[in-house]
Amino acid sequence: MSTAALLTLVRSGGNQVRRRVLLRARGLQDDRWVMPTCHSSTSEPKWSRFDPDGSGRPATWDNFGIWDNRLEEPILLPPSIKYGKPIPKVSLQNVGSASQIGKRKENEDRFGFAQLTNEVLYFAVYDGHGGPAAADFCHTHMEKCILDLLPKEENLETVLTLAFLEIDKTFARHAHLSADATLLTSGTTATVALLRDGIELVIASVGDSRAILCRKGKPMKLTIDHTPERKDEKERIKKCGGFVAWNSLGQPHVNGRLAMTRSLGDLDLKTSGVIAEPETKRIKLHHADDSFLVLTTDGINFMVNSQEICDFVNQCHDPNEAAHAVTEQAIQYGTEDNTTAVVVPFGAWGKYKNSEITFSFSRSFASSGRWA
């Protein structure tokens, strides 16, 4: 749709779009749509963005591929004019999250989401190992580090790369000044997403936590695991003087210790080729087709494949229920690890609810065949 057509629609007969624009212009926020912490058959039903009339049915779709007039959700006017089509606002209050300890003694996963500027939203998961210190450090300091870089750099991929490297250096200084020797072996994965103007999505990652975009009901993988199984990663480890050894389960580890080749922290393995530089990816969202972004830690990824994650989320009433459903499914499949999921809804949320779910009874046993 052209910019002129969009403005004409806003000024004249486009009641739904006009109302959203007016709400935005008056500075009204969408904090009226409070997400329930979880969804269950026994909990009192609450109206939300995903069931505005309390009917138990999702909102229908208008010809833009975004929510119809039962939703008083504003569009982002400047980006909509810039891109020539309505771009719905992504509200943090509609983001779903869940984190479960599993069978571990401690939950070393961390996650967060925040509005950094008027244009930029932040979402992240961190999966710590060797204690929670590195994950805690990233969870505490990553937002501010990115925020400090945004005025200096337009390219969000560059922003995230610089932020990862700076956080890693700062954690190293912190560890060397500390009397706690365990900090030298503490590390974490990091998968961070920035969303600018509701349409530009940029992902950076180190380790094996993942980001998946559900487009037309199918998963689009936005990250690639950094493991010694990757030829390029293994070659770097060897060139730096490190080695790869396999454990009793046939899983490769750097120097027999770490299952990933990139991380934040793990200071004792820096000279063996474990680096903090992330791989990045930038995509343009299509809200008519894109249902959600989901960030997951490996307690989920090792048990639930990408299509299954999309299917489970698509069957859920709201993102918070979806995040809990995904973590619970990994536990049912037999994971012993911490499980964390962050679900960010986009314009096509609920559009692909008819996706079929294939349940694997063999994986529902505690052993699941993976840990036998």
Swiss-Prot record:
UniProt-listed CDD domains: PP2Cc (cd00143)
Question: Which co-factors does it depend on?
Answer: Mn(2+)
**What detail does the entry give on cofactor binding?**
Binds 2 Mn(2+) ions per subunit.
PROSITE patterns listed in its UniProt record: PPM_1 (PS01032), PPM_2 (PS51746)
Q: Which residues bind Mn(2+) 1?
A: 127-128
Q: What is its EC number?
A: 3.1.3.16, 3.1.3.52
Q: Where is the PPM-type phosphatase domain?
A: 94-346
Entry GO MF terms: [3-methyl-2-oxobutanoate dehydrogenase (lipoamide)]-phosphatase activity; metal ion binding; protein serine/threonine phosphatase activity
SUPFAM superfamilies assigned to the protein according to its UniProt record, in alphabetical order: PP2C-like
Q: Which UniProt keywords apply?
A: Hydrolase, Manganese, Metal-binding, Mitochondrion, Phosphoprotein, Protein phosphatase, Transit peptide
Q: Which reaction does it catalyse?
A: O-phospho-L-seryl-[3-methyl-2-oxobutanoate dehydrogenase] + H2O = L-seryl-[3-methyl-2-oxobutanoate dehydrogenase] + phosphate; O-phospho-L-seryl-[protein] + H2O = L-seryl-[protein] + phosphate
**Subcellular location as annotated:** Mitochondrion matrix
Q: Show the segment(s) annotated as Critical for association with the BCKDH complex.
A: 46-61
**Its pathway?**
Protein modification
In the UniProt record, the transit peptide is located at 1-29
Family label? Belongs to the PP2C family.
Function field: Serine/threonine-protein phosphatase component of macronutrients metabolism. Forms a functional kinase and phosphatase pair with BCKDK, serving as a metabolic regulatory node that coordinates branched-chain amino acids (BCAAs) with glucose and lipid metabolism via two distinct phosphoprotein targets: mitochondrial BCKDHA subunit of the branched-chain alpha-ketoacid dehydrogenase (BCKDH) complex and cytosolic ACLY, a lipogenic enzyme of Krebs cycle.
Fill in the subunit field for this protein.
Monomer. Interacts with E1 and E2 components of the branched-chain alpha-ketoacid dehydrogenase (BCKDH) complex; this interaction requires colocalization in mitochondria. Interacts with BCKDHA but not with BCKDHB of the E1 component. Interacts with the 24-meric E2 core composed of DBT monomers with a 24:1 stoichiometry; the N-terminal region (residues 49-61) of PPM1K and C-terminal linker of the lipoyl domain of DBT (residues 145-160) are critical for this interaction, whereas the lipoyl prosthetic group is dispensable.
Q: What is this protein called?
A: Protein phosphatase Mn(2+)-dependent 1K
Q: What taxonomic classification does the UniProt entry list for its organism?
A: Eukaryota, Metazoa, Chordata, Craniata, Vertebrata
